[in-house]
């Protein structure tokens, strides 16, 4: 597999010795289908030939549920599987999250309603090499077409799609290579992954070598894209840190078509930006090399209780006790995912690397004692697995988090001092938010310097003091009224997220699990790093080729009501 990755890299570097012209024409807005500047069918055919026939004219995934393409059998299949990421992963254009799909048709709107493309990309390049990246970048610039980057489309903020856009689709770049890595900062086992690799791919390969890597809780998420570039929390984060903390180097094609290596010693500014500064804006990553670690046994804890046989007061008192004890779990290397509603609590799971069942039981004993003192019935399951992959398949992969969680989203990183000094106010916040029908998911972890050491990257600084990454969500039933959903989205922005912000005014939010309408997103998602990241963006993407919602530099643009991407006046 090394030959596959690096032969492509050498080929593009040779081609770049004689560089074609890059850059956009001097216009305010990107071209859209129907515009006089939109490429003709002949233009598209010529471009397709230049990339070996890899251009795809996209079709809405749900068109089988709408006239004139209606097919009852296909539509029923789509409706049954619509919430499974795998259905969308293999599509070059499907928008997974309903909240950012806008007017793109889905499998549940009326059959008679036209299947509009909405914010779906118009064309997609099934990329097989860095050369495909470079040629697509150049074509998008010459023809003034919006360009986006996509692997699986696992995306709550709409970064991997756009009306009238051309997409670089990396999904079938699946090479994985084991590396004995040596550098001034790290010597040890590592893996180089191509851009289309998904979590399940690398977990299985690593397990086969007796190793683990830091990756997402959802098996379908692609580690190389926005997950790691945005920081990336993991069930192993309290042991090793965030995904961005593991990166040794990147191979990336920038906005001028150059294939670059980005590491602490080569193009270090680009390495720093890609490692936590957000995806889809500095360039198109072809591969990523990350640290790997010896495998270990893992103990998992699943705990649930509800209000069926207890009062709301006692229920939320128990929630308070859980948060009180959470730092003890994370200090022991544990990572906890707790889903809280107004009537239920589900810890699913608490992942404890290299701990025995006895150690796990001892860790949670104080919390269990509080539940019993409150006379709250509970269900507890403690399971030990011989390897991390076994634990993952038993307790993480079967979770509801593996489904497409349609809803309105918001989030906040809550510092450790909130739990230590303001746990009463935190409990009141959880109660107020969940009483409105909002689901509160608290991801408990410790990625402070005591865990990660002296790392050098652009991860949002608020992560280093965070005890909880909170994701809020509301329900989005099939066929939901979009006006009603927009009202809930606005309440997320104006009411529920601000409740958490008041608890942590100097913190921020995990940019991949956030409110798409976050009003102060540069500060909230990037903190003090934003201005430096913006300068790096301009250095490696001088023509503003790459745009993604809430990505660095996206404030220079605005999306019109028809989906057209235009420069904000004064930004040229």
From Swiss-Prot:
One of its GO terms (molecular function) is oxidoreductase activity. Keywords: FAD, Flavoprotein, Glycoprotein, Oxidoreductase, Signal, Vacuole. Pathway: Mycotoxin biosynthesis; patulin biosynthesis. One of its GO terms (cellular component) is vacuole. Residues 1-23 form the signal peptide. It comes from the Eukaryota. Its EC number is 1.-.-.-. Patulin was originally used as an antibiotic and specifically trialed to be used against the common cold, but it is no longer used for that purpose since it has been shown to induce immunological, neurological and gastrointestinal effects. Genotoxic effects of patulin with dose-dependent increase in DNA strand breaks in brain, liver and kidneys have been detected in mice. However, more recently, it has been proposed that patulin might also have anti-tumor properties. Residues 115-295 form the FAD-binding PCMH-type domain. Its cofactor is FAD. One of its GO terms (biological process) is patulin biosynthetic process. It is found in: Vacuole lumen. PANTHER family: FAD BINDING DOMAIN PROTEIN (AFU_ORTHOLOGUE AFUA_6G12070)-RELATED, GULONOLACTONE OXIDASE. FAD-linked oxidoreductase; part of the gene cluster that mediates the biosynthesis of patulin, an acetate-derived tetraketide mycotoxin produced by several fungal species that shows antimicrobial properties against several bacteria. PatO acts with patJ in the vacuole to convert gentisyl alcohol to isoepoxydon. The pathway begins with the synthesis of 6-methylsalicylic acid by the polyketide synthase (PKS) patK via condensation of acetate and malonate units. Belongs to the oxygen-dependent FAD-linked oxidoreductase family. This is FAD-linked oxidoreductase patO. It comes from Aspergillus clavatus (strain ATCC 1007 / CBS 513.65 / DSM 816 / NCTC 3887 / NRRL 1 / QM 1276 / 107). The gene is patO.
